[in-house]
From Swiss-Prot:
Its EC number is 3.2.2.-. This is Putative 3-methyladenine DNA glycosylase. Belongs to the DNA glycosylase MPG family. One of its GO terms (biological process) is base-excision repair. Signal peptide: none annotated. The lineage of its organism: Bacteria, Bacillati, Actinomycetota, Actinomycetes, Kitasatosporales. SUPFAM superfamilies: FMT C-terminal domain-like (SSF50486). InterPro entries: Formyl_transferase-like_C_sf, MPG, MPG_sf. It comes from Streptomyces coelicolor (strain ATCC BAA-471 / A3(2) / M145). Keywords: DNA damage, DNA repair, Hydrolase. GO terms for molecular function: alkylbase DNA N-glycosylase activity; DNA binding.
C-alpha cells in the first residue's frame, strides 16, 4: 500500500537546516505517539525555536551537559526535559550535528486518539485544551524521559514519529517573543503559531520568581 502524502515521514534533511527555517515549517506537521495504551495523532499549531549556544534562552547556551546531550546530536531526534519538578516538555533537534539547536513543541490539535488524551488531561475543559501548552502537549501524548533521544524521522515503527502533514501557508503563520523567556533571549520573535487557531497557548512574558523571605 502506498502511503498518502500527508502521512509520509519527514526526512532527516528537513531538520538539517537552520532552526529559524525549521520552526515555522513544523506548523501543520503530524506527530504520531504510539504507546502501550494506543496511538495519539497530533497536528502541530505552535512551536518555539532555540538556537543552541548562540541563544541565551537555550538549554545549550552554556555548553554540553548530560542533560542536554541529545541537543548536540543528529537532527530529527527528540529532546525531552523535566521542568518545575512536575512536567515534561518535548523538542525536536535540528541543524547540523553539534549545533545544538532545537524546536520546542508548544501546542497542537489532537486529531486521533482524543479519548486516550482525555484520560491523561482530566483538567482540560474541552478537546482544544488537551495539548494547549508544552507541558500539556507532553502530558496528553504520554511523553517522559524514555523518549529522550528517539529518532522521530524514520519509516520504522517507533514510539514517536513526525510526518509530513499539511504545511501551513506563510500568510497564516504568526510570530512573536517566546513565552516566559527572560533577559536577552526574551526579545527574539522566535515563537511561531497558526493564526486564529484555538489550540494555541496564550503568550506570557517572563515573571521573576519571588524569593521566600
Amino acid at each position: 500500500m502506498i502511503a498518502s502524502p500527508d502521512r509520509t515521514p519527514l526526512p532527516r534533511e528537513f531538520f538539517d537546516r537552520p532552526v529559524l527555517e525549521v520552526a515555522p515549517d513544523l506548523l501543520g506537521r503530524i506527530l504520531v505517539r504510539t504507546g502501550p495504551d494506543g496511538p495519539i495523532t497530533l497536528r502541530l499549531t505552535e512551536v518555539e525555536a532555540y538556537d543552541g549556544q548562540n541563544d541565551p534562552g537555550s538549554h545549550a547556551y552554556r555548553g554540553r551537559t548530560p542533560r542536554n546531550e541529545v541537543m548536540f546530536g543528529p537532527p530529527g531526534h527528540v529532546y525531552v526535559y523535566f521542568t518545575y519538578g512536575m512536567w515534561f516538555c518535548m523538542n525536536l533537534v535540528c541543524g547540523p550535528e553539534g549545533r545544538s539547536s532545537a524546536v520546542l513543541l508548544r501546542a497542537g490539535e489532537i486529531i486521533d486518539g482524543a479519548e486516550l488524551a482525555r484520560t491523561r488531561r482530566l483538567s482540560a475543559r474541552n478537546d482544544k485544551e488537551l495539548a494547549k501548552g508544552p507541558a500539556r502537549l507532553a502530558t496528553a501524548l504520554g511523553v517522559d524521559r524514555a523518549l529522550n533521544g528517539t529518532d522521530a524521522c524514520t519509516s520504522q515503527e517507533t514510539p514517536l514519529r513526525i510526518l509530513t502533514g499539511t504545511p501551513v501557508p506563510g500568510d497564516q503563520v504568526r510570530n512573536g517573543p517566546r513565552t516566559g523567556v527572560a533577559g536577552e533571549g526574551g526579545v527574539h520573535p522566535w515563537r511561531y503559531w497558526v493564526a486564529d487557531d484555538p489550540t494555541v497557548s496564550p503568550y506570557r512574558a517572563h515573571v521573576p520568581r519571588k524569593r521566600r523571605s
